[in-house]
Amino acid sequence: MERLLLWVSVLASLPEAFAHRDLTGKVFVFPRESATDHVKLITKLEKPLQNFTLCFRAYSDLSRGYSLFSYNLQGKDNELLVFKHRIGEYSLYIGKTKVTFKVREVFPRPVHICTSWESSTGIAEFWINGEPLVKKGLRQGYSVGAYPRIVLGQEQDSYGGGFDKTQSFVGEIGDLYMWGSVLSPNEIRLVYQGLSFPHPTILDWQALNYEMNGYVVIKPRVWS
């Protein structure tokens, strides 16, 4: 009987730490700098990516650098990484190679980010609040590997670990979607506006599988 009660207690605690939920109107809040607090995003990605688009909203008052989206493979870090180095400067890493995008920003202010990459041309796009930045090119012909470990709140230096609190994210993240294709400019603007857009094939904020670790809280999004 005691063992049964223990399992009931464990199962009762799972919905918040490990869940499949519609998070519409919600955000993950990372309230402090740490080397532990993070969210794992769970996806069954079994084939390498030739193309992708990733979109999300973020709000932070950090002026130092921090990771926004970290996608690692077993034995390969920075396979796909979105990193903000400083105010107005973002980088996209593909297979440890990076390109940097610069934008004039009002700080602190919520931001909507979309970034895409296609293997055939190597062209990477970066959109801030529905507006495109100058296109860059990297890793033409490369394939982003399958079976990733995807983390929000920390930058991975190993597969699901190797965190450094000086690169941790402090703030709020929401409305995260990922496709295995390059969205058109019109589609990216629809995502930014929160209107009807193509169904996400990799990560879907409205049906998200995730695991929260450490001090991470889900709260309503009160900013736009």
Swiss-Prot record:
It comes from the Eukaryota. One of its GO terms (molecular function) is complement component C1q complex binding. Ca(2+) 2 binds at residues 155, 157, 167. It is found in: Secreted. Keywords: Amyloid, Calcium, Disulfide bond, Glycoprotein, Lectin, Metal-binding, Secreted, Signal. Residues 24-224 form the Pentraxin (PTX) domain. Its cofactor is Ca(2+). Disulfide bonds join 55-114. GO terms for cellular component: extracellular space. Binds 2 calcium ions per subunit. The keyword S-adenosyl-L-methionine does not apply. Gene3D superfamilies: 2.60.120.200. PANTHER family: C-REACTIVE PROTEIN-RELATED, SERUM AMYLOID P-COMPONENT. Belongs to the pentraxin family. It is linked to SAP is a precursor of amyloid component P which is found in basement membrane and associated with amyloid deposits. Homopentamer. Pentraxin (or pentaxin) have a discoid arrangement of 5 non-covalently bound subunits. This is Serum amyloid P-component. It comes from Sus scrofa. The gene is APCS.
